Amino acid sequence: MDIKSALARIVGHLDLSTEEMRDVMRQIMTGQCSEAQIGAFLMGMRMKSESIDEIVGAVSVMRELADKVELKSLDGVVDIVGTGGDGANIFNVSTASAFVLAAAGCTVAKHGNRAVSGKSGSADLLEAAGIYLNLTPTQVARCIDSLGIGFMFAQSHHSAMKHAAGPRRELGLRTLFNMLGPLTNPAGVKHQVVGVFAQALCRPLAEVLQRLGSKHVLVVHSKDGLDEFSLAAPTFVAELKNDEITEYWVEPEDLGMKSQSLHGLAVDNPQASLELIRDALGRRKTENGQKAAEMIVLNAGAALYAADHAMTLAQGVELAHDVLHTGLAWEKLQELGAFTAVFKVENEA
């Protein structure tokens, strides 16, 4: 199916099949469509609402065209990632949590990008921390094999996305592509915590990941609007495990945590996020640092469970708490900075 035929279908509020969506996405991602066609397609899909078949088709093409990171094994390899777009401008919880996971002995293949709507994306934060981002897939794999953690900078692995960049920027609205980032990890992880910008997406994206072969995934959105587990409100979870999807609400108290406001956790820039994380993973000298630590524990705990490193969510949170208080997570971040500095010298020689 070509994009003109797809547009005619979408205008009539009719869904595309998975194979038809694959055809259209290949045309978009290989530069065969005009910017006007891409913009119209993205807006039409948004107004119609993307079906599970369509998202599966789009994700499969993005995965197919990605510059992949080849790991020795995917057993228990985990990613913790959000769509962004929640408007809260909270510090980089998922990225901080990734270092707690690595310090706990998990293997982490973290996928992320620069901020689109927020103040600090995962790439912005890591750059502020002195971590070199422009790695080859082989170099990322070496980070993961050696340290138990590596960062895949989305724009380095999904170069075909450049064809949609102009229309996305000019539209300035959330589109299908906002959903695709967390679903297109270049290492092909089967274990994830995926935060989304709307509760209505939790079940559908869990179904998409089920269709694409994921093993244990939590797709989450909190009642106060975050694309992660919140300290201040219940969080809705669609969990894929043993090829079945269950849906439930989780309150901080269910996991041995105390509910509290998120006041003091918003940041204006990557440096502010880094300073808060440094305090949270270190000596927690400030009230905000202590609160940030608890937010990290909550989300890292969920990812330990998704990685099957813990038997239950509550056990994952308990383990994350113990690991965070060792100070090893901050050491892991510094190790990644030193390790990638060597690659920077190699790449720029």
UniProtKB/Swiss-Prot annotation:
EC number: 2.4.2.18
Manner of cofactor binding, per the entry note: Binds 2 magnesium ions per monomer.
Binding site for Mg(2+) 1: S94, E228
Annotated GO CC locations: cytosol
Enzyme class, first EC level, given as a word: transferase
Keywords (A to Z) from UniProt: Amino-acid biosynthesis, Aromatic amino acid biosynthesis, Glycosyltransferase, Magnesium, Metal-binding, Transferase, Tryptophan biosynthesis
Cofactor: Mg(2+)
GO biological process, one term: L-tryptophan biosynthetic process
Binding annotation for Mg(2+) 2: D227, E228
Residues that bind anthranilate 1: G82, N113
Domain of life: Bacteria
Protein's pathway: Amino-acid biosynthesis; L-tryptophan biosynthesis; L-tryptophan from chorismate: step 2/5
Listed transmembrane segments: none
Residue numbers binding anthranilate 2: R168
Chemical reaction(s) catalysed: N-(5-phospho-beta-D-ribosyl)anthranilate + diphosphate = 5-phospho-alpha-D-ribose 1-diphosphate + anthranilate
InterPro entries (alphabetical): Anthranilate_Pribosyl_Tfrase, Glycosyl_Trfase_fam3, Glycosyl_Trfase_fam3_N_dom, Glycosyl_Trfase_fam3_N_dom_sf, Nuc_phospho_transferase
A molecular function (GO) term: anthranilate phosphoribosyltransferase activity
Subunit description: Homodimer.
Family: Belongs to the anthranilate phosphoribosyltransferase family.
Listed HAMAP family: TrpD
Function: Catalyzes the transfer of the phosphoribosyl group of 5-phosphorylribose-1-pyrophosphate (PRPP) to anthranilate to yield N-(5'-phosphoribosyl)-anthranilate (PRA).
PANTHER family for the chain: ANTHRANILATE PHOSPHORIBOSYLTRANSFERASE (PTHR43285:SF2)
Name the UniProt record assigns to this protein: Anthranilate phosphoribosyltransferase
Source species of the chain: Pseudomonas putida (strain GB-1)
